[in-house]
Structure formats: C-alpha cells, structure tokens
Regions:
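Predominantly soluble domains enriched in secretory-pathway, periplasmic, or organellar proteins
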Residues: 2-13, 18-341
C-alpha cells in the first residue's frame, strides 16, 4: 500500500469512527430519557420545632396506614416490627386490641362503613380483611406481587393494586377472580360512589380510570411529576397528591379522566383523606410536618387551616361521623388526634 493510500484509508476509518460513536451515544441518551423516574417518597421529616396540635398518644412501632370507621368509632393503624393492626378508640385514643398480621401494610381502607378493614400485606402478597369491632381476620386472599393499596366498589368488589407486578387484583367473596394491567408501579387506588376506579401509577406518572363492573379502561391521563396517593370525592372526582410536584391534582373521572384543577402545595404533600360529609380534604406535608385542611370547591380547593403534626406524618384519616382527624407519626410511634375548628 502506498503512503497516500494508507493516509486515505486511515482518514476514512477515523471518519467512520467519529460518525458511529455519536449515534450510539444518542441512542443511550434517548434510552435514558425514556426510563421512568424512581417512585416518589415522602420527605424525611426533621425533628419537631413546634408542639403538635390536639392530643398525641403512643400507638406502636412505625405507624403508617390508617383508616377511621364511622360506625364503630374505631381507628385502624398499621404497625411494623412487629407487624400488627392496632384498633384504637377514636374518642379516647386508647388502643383496644392488636391484631397480628402476616406482613406490614402502608395503606388501609374500609370495605364499607362498619368494616372489614382492607389490609394489603405487602411482603406476603395477600389482602387481609379484619372485622370490626372484634378484630378477627375474616379472610386472607393471595393476590399479586407486593400489594400496596386496596379499595372497594359500591358493589363490594375489591381492587388491590400490586406495585411490583403493575397489575390490579379483583377480589370477590374472599378470593381473587382476575387481574387487570395498570400503569407502571401502581401505588394508589380509589373508587367513586358511581363505581369508577382510579389507579395512580407512581412510576408511570398517570391516573388511569376503570369501570368497576366491566373492568374496561376509560383512559389514562398525566398525573404530575410524582404522584403517590389518590382519593375519590363527590361528583365522581379524584384527588391526587403530586408529592414530587408539590401539588394536589383534581380530576373528573368520566366519561374519560381529565385534569380540571391543580392546587400548589409546597412541602412534599403525601397522605390524603376526604371528609365527604363536610366536603373537606386533608393533606399531610411531610417536609413541613403540617396537615392542611381544605374545603372542596368545584375545580379547586380553599385552604381553611394548617396544624402542626407529629414527626413524619405520612398518613391521615377522617371519621366523617365526628369530623375528628387522625395523623400517624411514623418516627416516634405516635397517633395525633385533632378536633378541627
């Protein structure tokens, strides 16, 4: 090969290398951009700088997951190490009994007023139902991988979102009768009085709505920068805490899900509860250790008050019969009881 030919070949190889490498880099960059963000988490709360409002009682280790029953007046609180469900008298704050669970839970709900309590036991891949007021386990149903949240339709059909499988299990009469696919990593589920099921994909960053009877999907819509929890409200609306985006998002459920409002709420909003009798919404701010009381006003929310909370207020519940509000303090094993104005 002549010196000139060698230079020509070397130049062509160099150009080919230059042209090839950026294409590969661009492909890797595009793949990285397509990868969904990690699931949002609550802020890690600093030590308290203000006395919590209302009363504070000791409830047990690492409480997270709470629901208040308007018929019995009991409050169910999920604990871990050991994995238990504490049944607390809402008025006095006294723990009446503790129910051993196969695994810990982070979300609780009621199948109906009066119970049973729906307990998605994450590590055991099961839905445990606990009767009220006695605390007896009425059923333990195998479901999908890492059940994170559960909610019941007016018909009694129960929907359990399986976070690691990106599915929802449908449970009737204590047994799983089927599954439906959901958005990536479903972390929250709620059902309207009209039988529409809202599922939040905490990594898919969407709200998807299903018909509870037919299981047909009515569609998906964006759910902010990092949604975590969803609650159903009046007029077939869903309220979603966008924890990473510092907001509460408001949606019409049907005929197709549509975002109709956004309320800015800095402070890492996380836990959320609806008081249907008073048309109020409660949201915990884990970065600021506050719980915020809102009035539901159509497409928006009107702030009523803020209350200092126990440390790491990840979950909140309201007893609609009394208006009493309960907040879990995960760090110190406490339950806060508020009598709002």
């Amino acid at each position: 090969m002549t010196h000139l030919s060698f230079r020509r070949v070397f130049t062509l190889l160099t150009l080919a290398t230059i042209l090839f490498v950026p294409v590969g880099c661009r492909a890797e960059q595009n793949a990285a951009q397509r990868k969904p963000p990690p699931a949002p988490e609550p802020a890690e709360a600093p030590p308290l700088d203000e006395q919590p409002a209302g009363r504070v009682v000791e409830v047990g280790s690492a409480p997270e997951g709470i629901v208040a029953d308007p018929e019995s007046g009991l409050v169910a609180v999920a604990l871990r190490n050991p994995n238990e469900l504490a049944l607390v008298e809402g008025e006095s704050g006294e723990t009446l009994r503790r129910v051993e669970l196969p695994e810990s839970a982070r979300h609780l709900d009621l199948a109906a007023p009066g119970g049973p309590v729906l307990v998605p036991a994450e590590g055991s891949d099961s839905l445990v139902q606990v009767g009220l007021p006695d605390g007896g386990i009425t059923s333990e149903t195998p479901v999908g991988d890492f059940p994170h949240s559960a909610a019941a339709a007016p018909s009694g059909r129960i929907f359990v979102v399986n976070e690691m499988a990106s599915t929802a299990s449908i449970v009737e009469d204590g047994r799983e009768i089927g599954k439906i696919d959901t958005a990536l990593k479903p972390g929250g589920v709620a059902v309207t009085d009209s039988g529409l099921v809202g599922v939040v994909g905490v990594r898919g960053l969407t709200l998807e709505v299903f018909d509870a009877g037919t299981l047909e999907s009515l569609g998906r819509t964006d759910a902010g920068e990092g949604p975590t929890h969803v609650r159903a409200g009046p007029e077939s609306r869903f309220y979603v805490t966008d924890t990473r985006g510092d907001a509460v998002l408001i949606y019409e459920a049907g005929p197709q899900p549509k975002q109709i409002g956004r309320v800015s709420l800095p402070g890492s909003p996380y836990g959320i509860a609806i008081d249907p009798r008073r048309d109020q919404l409660w949201v915990t701010l884990t970065a600021e250790q506050r719980v915020v009381q809102f009035a539901l006003e159509g497409r928006t929310l009107r702030e009523i008050a803020r209350y200092p909370t126990v440390r790491q207020p990840n979950t909140v519940a309201v007893d609609p019969a009394t208006g009493r509000v309960f907040v879990t303090g995960k760090t110190d094993g406490q339950l806060q009881i508020l009598e709002p104005r």
